[in-house]
Amino acid sequence: MKYLWVALGGALGALARYTVGVWIYERLGTRFPYGTFAINVTGCFLIGLALTVLDAHMDLSPAWRLAIPTGFIGAYTTFSTFEYETLRAAQHGQMGTAVLYFGSSLALGILAVWLGMVVGNRIVA
């Protein structure tokens, strides 16, 4: 049953990732990897929020921890695509884009996790 919860969350996370990515790229274009950037930063926020709330509610079924952080957020975010896009920008001589993407992803990712934890703590308070 554990695998089913991960798979269910993962399927929904993958669909959300695809939908959000397409929506962003259709509006902002592909000069910068806006879709992956937005997905990873919002995923960082969601992991901070979800784990803070789930940790405060240990009485919830373990299925929630499998379905949301492991399944949904795990499939929604994409470290490998982030790394690939950073390397491809550098290989194409777009060092400014590569450095900006790398640095802003890390900085805003950490900030988003923290913000998610702050919001999560307010929810459970």
UniProtKB/Swiss-Prot annotation:
The record lists the catalysed reaction(s) as: fluoride(in) = fluoride(out)
Q: For this entry, list what GO says about its biological process.
A: cellular detoxification of fluoride
* UniProt source species: Acidobacterium capsulatum (strain ATCC 51196 / DSM 11244 / BCRC 80197 / JCM 7670 / NBRC 15755 / NCIMB 13165 / 161)
Q: Which UniProt keywords apply?
A: Cell inner membrane, Cell membrane, Ion channel, Ion transport, Membrane, Metal-binding, Sodium, Transmembrane, Transmembrane helix, Transport
Subcellular location, principal: membrane
Q: Please give the GO cellular component terms listed in this UniProt entry.
A: plasma membrane
Q: Where can this protein be found?
A: Cell inner membrane
* Functional description taken from the UniProt entry: Fluoride-specific ion channel. Important for reducing fluoride concentration in the cell, thus reducing its toxicity.
Q: Spell out the activity regulation.
A: Na(+) is not transported, but it plays an essential structural role and its presence is essential for fluoride channel function.
The topology of this chain with respect to the membrane is: Multi-pass membrane protein
Query: What InterPro entries does the record point to?
Result: FluC (IPR003691)
Residues given in the record as Na(+) binding sites: 74, 77
User: What name is this protein filed under?
Assistant: Fluoride-specific ion channel FluC
What family name appears in the similarity comment? Belongs to the fluoride channel Fluc/FEX (TC 1.A.43) family.
